[in-house]
Design a protein with these regions (language model features):
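Metabolite-binding pocket within alpha/beta catalytic cores that recognizes anionic/polar moieties
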Residues: 9-157, 161-162, 217
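Flexible, glycine/charged-enriched surface loops at secondary-structure junctions
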Residues: 64-68, 172-177, 264-267
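Active-site rim beta-loop-alpha module in soluble metabolic enzymes
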Residues: 153-198
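Generic non-transmembrane alpha-helical segments
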Residues: 162-170, 214, 254-265
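Zn-dependent metallopeptidase/amidohydrolase metal-coordination segment
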Residues: 209-244
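His/Asp/Glu-rich mid-to-C-terminal helical/loop segments that flank catalytic regions of hydrolases
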Residues: 232-267
């Protein structure tokens, strides 16, 4: 990877020189929020506003924290579920924002086990049709992950086999495979789609590489599953499944069961 980049760019290391573990960060979350809190262990990362509003309406939710930003604060809630207290929040979209939110929520609440679910684009309709997608690796086509993990093309999704066991025990249809994390859906070009497919990617999304990198860096446990909404086929872009993939409630109740059953000691 490094040889390839250096050859192409004449030795200019650019983004691959961003991983620095030899000096301390100047900006720390304590500067904004004070000391770290320890309120919950598990948290769900919600992308769908429809699902988020359903949760607020149907569960006895309690706000426990707030992530502050100049363009609007994001509340963090808890809900009770089968003798568990589980946090949740509506995340911004995109690798940098979604990953940064996980770090802030950990500081504000103590949650270190994160369940993330949402829609994606299928690169292989035959493989993904009617199945939940459990990513095994994510192509790092974004920027944030290079600050939190050594430069490589792909990052491993370390809890994929634990999730696969959960799905298998419940006889839920699923497929495991590589995915592509991109920063720009408008640059999912024919050549790039073809290249990612040749490498074994079955889906494309916009958060996972960064979220996994920051989770690995800080010692969080991430459980991620996806549902294909659109299909990227050259000359025939299909969008029929987008609404269901984004907003159907089956993913919520599945995520709640995952949160309940993943017995991992939080930090």
């Amino acid at each position: 990877f490094l040889v390839k980049i250096n050859k192409i760019y004449g030795g200019n290391r650019m983004i691959i020189d961003s991983y620095d573990i030899n000096s301390e960060p100047i900006v720390k979350l304590e500067n904004f929020y004070g000391e770290k809190q320890h309120l919950v262990k598990k948290c769900m990362v919600i992308f769908s506003k429809v699902i988020y509003e359903y949760m607020l309406e149907k569960f006895p939710c309690r706000q426990i924290a707030e992530v502050r930003a100049c363009n609007g604060n994001i509340p963090v809630w808890t809900l009770p579920y089968e003798e568990e207290t589980i946090a949740f929040y509506l995340t911004p979209i995109g690798s940098a924002l979604a990953a940064g939110m996980i770090a802030e929520v950990n500081h504000l609440t103590g949650a270190s086990v994160f369940i993330m679910f949402g829609s994606c684009g299928s690169l292989d309709k035959e493989a993904t049709d009617g199945k939940f997608i459990l990513p095994t690796e994510a192509y790092r086509g974004e920027g944030l992950s290079y600050y939190f993990a050594e430069p490589q093309d792909y990052i491993k999704i370390k809890n994929t086999d634990k999730l696969a066991e959960f799905f298998k025990e419940r006889k839920l249809p699923y497929v495991q495979g590589r995915v592509w994390t991109t920063d720009s859906m408008l640059r999912e070009t024919v050549n790039l789609v073809r290249k990612r497919k040749e490498e074994g990617c079955i889906a494309v999304e916009m958060e996972l590489a960064g979220v996994q990198a920051i989770s690995d860096f800080y010692g969080f446990e991430l459980y991620d599953f996806l549902v294909a909404g659109d299909v990227l086929i050259e000359g025939n872009y299909e969008t029929d499944g987008l609404s269901a993939a984004n907003h159907d409630l089956d993913k919520l109740f599945l995520a709640l069961q995952i949160a309940k059953n993943m017995r991992i000691e939080g930090r």
